[in-house]
Amino acid sequence: MGTLLEWLSEGDLTTDGRANEVAELVASSPQLFPDLIAALSFSEPAVRGHAADALEKIARNHPEWVLDYLPALRRAAIADPVAMVRWHLAMVFGHLAGFGETQGPSCQTLERLLHDRSATVRSWALTSLCIIGRLSPNRSPLITRQISALTRDPSAAVRKRARRALETLTNSGLPFPKGWAKGKKVLSEV
């Protein structure tokens, strides 16, 4: 875990640090994936933030790697005091949307994140819920009700994203908003 931890330690929470390089390293050496997951529990906030960033990037192309860790990631998404960790994990749940068995647990966590103190976390939580709702129309009515409350959010950015999500969920003919779904598996399905 030496090199991985060194790279994750570089920079602070205002930067991505070396998360891109960590993501490339772990993607090319999958045996390091458990070490990346372990870094989410490290005491240093920047390490956890950069680990979550790298994990999100890996989950775009390898969402199946994350499945065994879903319970721990759900706990971290709710409990970690670092907003960067919470928003990247909210994004990961969107990458998992193509795996039907993850949708219920992911929705429960994302619903809680809709009330997060960070506007960025709320924004990515509603985005991932929108992805799930688009892929699973049976979940869409409940998700639509939850997201509609965010059209009155204190953050203008969250209000705007909530309105766009509602349009996307209620009009299947609309293309999915560019930049919202970043994972290969999800992009092919929304």
What annotation goes with each model-predicted range?
Residues F42-A76, D80:
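A glycine-rich, hydrophobic loop/mini-helix early in the fold
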Residues I131-V190:
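Hydrophobic secondary-structure block in the mid-to-C-terminal portion of proteins
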Residues S9-D12, A27, S41, A59-R60, ...:
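Alpha-solenoid HEAT/Armadillo repeat architecture
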Residues L5, D16-N20, P34, G49-A52, ...:
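Alpha-solenoid HEAT/ARM repeat scaffold
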Residues M1-R48, E167-N171, K182-V190:
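N-terminal alpha-helical scaffold/docking segments in eukaryotic complex subunits
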Residues M1-L5, S29-L40, P63-A76, E101-L113, ...:
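Amphipathic alpha-helical scaffolding segments comprising HEAT/armadillo-like alpha-solenoid repeats
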Residues L13-D16, P45-A46, A79, A83-M84, ...:
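Alpha-helix N-cap/helix-start positions at coil->helix boundaries
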Residues E56, G94, C130-I131, E167:
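Structural signature of alpha-helical solenoid repeat scaffolds
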